[in-house]
């Protein structure tokens, strides 16, 4: 088996699978970083006998990205049980991983960790590490104050009329000592279950409102307790994976595109488990809307796949009634109507985010394969020469872009492609010193400076451009043409505007639109996107320097505290929106310091 190119593999958590020539899954594994993990299979000479055998008969390796390593564990666990890959080590039983259980069958439910399924309890998991799960239970206990004691201790507390130890220190809501009614306690259990099932936004919103109210009333101790609960909830959420009820059976579909190629990803979920992952690429038609693309993709997907009972989407597809009729006509089971859902609940939305991430990853992988192909790259150059009517092959292409920082600090960027590939050593940044915020004048200045550096360069030199691309429209193109005339050089120049991917040529009133899905258009898009990325990188550096200098204006802030603020808040807008409790929670920041920072941030009117 030929190993995949390292650059094609995402640096994300996920589950990978090796398959034989018949598509049978031989091995399933999980990884915190797919690129590093899969790379180790093909670079490590000291492999075990089992892995060496698996690689010798494998013909294909695939992967599915997920949100975190917990979700990776759950998907791996599900697929090992579903497909029984012959090269995986067999688990003795389901006790290998711990679960979180809520004993809803008891009159006063409790929260506990278990390695085996408990009758009349709702289970969440499995989880990869039991010590992480213990921390999670501790955090959930802090938020909901749910009983965790054993039935024996609970009965003893009821008999004595005194709460258990956790009830005495207010870590438990105290159902054993009748500090709360049965109805109030059941409400807490209901909130806990909703939180664990992914319905977290309402709880966080409620806690934040209470915290702000306490802060406004100067009840800082109560506000601090609520702040700790919010932080605990956010920590639990960061460790949680997508949890689907066993009753959920549906296809989750996401479509992303770059205006020429659409990437479609489908997760087939049966009884709450991801059973299969499918991926395709389609050519996107010209002027096709997102909803039309979604409808077209669904039709093509179910020309290949069997129909599910339910299809879950982010957005409403176009011609929904006609699409539903088409799918139901194809459905063999006439008694069951296919449901298309485009308002997913919070739980389903989280899984759809994972599906969308995989679609984006596959689209990028497709683009990388396409751009790395030598034949395709040279075809794109020949196409450009033909469509732009150039005298020679555009071996060296330079692209120019103008960017700003908060409407000031104008800068220009230049990226260079040679033979259809980026030449990063030739990239350049230019600081533009123009009094007014004028893109046209800035572009004129940028091109003049670049052209003057070429006056001593021979036209047959590899450093001399064969084509200049301006990121913008007619005004920016006019500025570039003016710069060429002023310096006295003749280099083909075109402007590329993003709205319709139009190319503007000097002296021509109408724009040129390259054929969609052509290699030449793909190359120009890649050059333009690289120009944006390079410009954004420089502006990010300048923004950080600007932000730091403005923070030093606040009295009483030294270098260490400024760096702490920058790590916690990315902008002055965030500092102004933050509560005094949020700022004072930073190490070394008291309430007075936090109040001073808030006052100064408002006074400086910083953005």
UniProtKB/Swiss-Prot annotation:
Cystines in this chain: none
GO biological process, one term: nucleotide-excision repair
Main location as per UniProt: cytoplasm
PROSITE patterns: GIY_YIG (PS50164), UVR (PS50151), UVRC (PS50165)
Domain UVR, residue spans: 201-236
Molecular-function annotations in GO: DNA binding; excinuclease ABC activity
Ranges where the GIY-YIG domain occurs: 11-89
Recorded GO CC terms: cytoplasm; excinuclease repair complex
Keywords recorded for this protein, A-Z: Cytoplasm, DNA damage, DNA excision, DNA repair, Excision nuclease, SOS response
Function: The UvrABC repair system catalyzes the recognition and processing of DNA lesions. UvrC both incises the 5' and 3' sides of the lesion. The N-terminal half is responsible for the 3' incision and the C-terminal half is responsible for the 5' incision.
Assembly: Interacts with UvrB in an incision complex.
Family membership: Belongs to the UvrC family.
Protein name: UvrABC system protein C
Phylogenetic placement of the source organism: Bacteria, Bacillati, Actinomycetota, Actinomycetes, Micrococcales
Gene (UniProt): uvrC
């Amino acid at each position: 088996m030929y190993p995949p190119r390292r650059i094609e593999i995402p640096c994300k958590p996920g589950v990978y699978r090796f398959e034989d020539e018949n598509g049978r899954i031989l091995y399933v594994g999980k990884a915190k970083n797919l690129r590093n993990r899969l790379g180790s299979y093909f670079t490590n000479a000291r492999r075990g006998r089992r892995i060496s055998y698996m690689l010798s008969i494998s013909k294909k390796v695939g992967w599915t990205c997920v949100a975190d390593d917990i979700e990776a564990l759950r998907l791996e666990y599900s697929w090992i049980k579903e497909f029984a890959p012959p090269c995986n080590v067999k688990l003795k039983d389901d006790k290998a991983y711990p679960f979180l259980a809520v004993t809803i069958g008891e009159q006063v439910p409790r929260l506990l960790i278990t390695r085996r399924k408990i009758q009349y309890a709702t289970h969440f998991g499995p989880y990869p590490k039991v010590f992480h799960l213990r921390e999670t239970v501790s955090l959930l206990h802090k938020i909901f104050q749910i009983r965790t004691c054993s039935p024996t201790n609970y009965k003893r507390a009821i008999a004595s009329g005194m709460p258990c130890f956790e009830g005495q220190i207010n870590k438990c809501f105290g159902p054993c000592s009748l500090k709360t009614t049965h109805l109030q306690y059941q409400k807490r259990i209901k909130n806990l279950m909703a939180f664990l099932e992914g319905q977290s936004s309402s709880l966080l919103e409620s806690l934040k409102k209470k915290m702000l109210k306490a802060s406004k009333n100067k009840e800082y101790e109560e506000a601090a307790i609520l702040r700790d609960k919010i932080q605990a909830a956010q920590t639990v959420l960061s460790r949680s994976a997508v949890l689907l009820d066993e009753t959920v059976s549906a296809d989750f579909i996401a479509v992303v595109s770059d205006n020429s190629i659409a990437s479609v990803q489908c997760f087939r979920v049966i009884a709450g488990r991801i059973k299969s992952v499918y991926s395709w690429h389609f050519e996107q038609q010209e002027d096709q809307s997102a909803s039309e693309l979604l409808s077209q993709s669904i039709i093509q997907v179910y020309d290949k796949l069997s129909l599910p009972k339910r299809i879950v989407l982010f957005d409403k597809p176009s011609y929904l009634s006609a699409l539903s009729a088409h799918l139901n006509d194809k459905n063999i089971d006439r008694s069951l109507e296919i449901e298309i859902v485009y308002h997913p609940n919070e739980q389903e939305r989280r899984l759809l985010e994972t599906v969308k991430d995989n679609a984006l990853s596959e689209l990028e992988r497709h683009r990388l394969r396409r751009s790395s192909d030598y034949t395709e790259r040279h075809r794109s150059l020949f196409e450009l020469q033909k469509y732009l009517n150039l005298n020679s092959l555009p071996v060296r292409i330079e692209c120019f872009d103008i960017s700003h920082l908060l409407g000031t600090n104008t800068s220009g960027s230049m990226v260079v492609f040679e033979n259809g590939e980026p030449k990063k050593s030739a990239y350049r940044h230019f600081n533009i010193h123009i009094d007014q915020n004028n893109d046209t004048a800035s572009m004129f200045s940028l091109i003049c400076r670049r052209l003057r550096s070429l006056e001593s360069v021979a036209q047959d030199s590899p450093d001399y451009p064969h084509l200049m691309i301006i990121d913008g429209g007619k005004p920016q193109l006019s500025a570039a043409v003016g710069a060429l005339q002023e310096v006295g050089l003749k280099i083909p120049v075109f402007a590329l505007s993003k709205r319709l991917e139009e190319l503007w040529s000097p002296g021509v009133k109408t724009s040129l639109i390259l054929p969609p899905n052509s290699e030449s258009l793909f190359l120009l898009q890649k050059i333009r996107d690289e120009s944006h990325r390079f410009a954004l990188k420089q502006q990010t550096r300048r923004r950080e320097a600007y932000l730091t200098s403005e923070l030093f204006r606040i009295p009483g802030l030294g270098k260490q505290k400024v760096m702490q603020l920058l790590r916690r808040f990315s902008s002055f807008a965030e500092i102004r929106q933050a509560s005094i409790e949020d700022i004072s929670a930073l190490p070394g920041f008291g309430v007075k310091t936090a109040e001073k920072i808030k006052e100064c941030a408002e006074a400086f009117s910083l953005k």
